[in-house]
Amino acid sequence: MNHLFVLFVNYHGFVGDNDSIVLNLMAARYFDSREEAEEHRIELYGNERYEFQNRISILEWL
């Protein structure tokens, strides 16, 4: 049985001192295995170049 893993990324950050912005950018990507998705999740979670907090979840379909 094949499994489908999708990685969704939510960005939440701040612009300026008083302005906040929530970008619900659902960047979906498909992976063949949970391990591959987890490796990419860890890779994305460490990326802070835009000073956004990365909220990442993996959804699994059987």
What do these predicted ranges mean?
Residues 1-26, 53-56:
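Short aromatic-glycine-(Arg/Gly/Cys) micro-motifs in beta-strand/loop hairpins
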Residues 25-30, 38-62:
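Short, mixed-charge low-complexity intrinsically disordered segments
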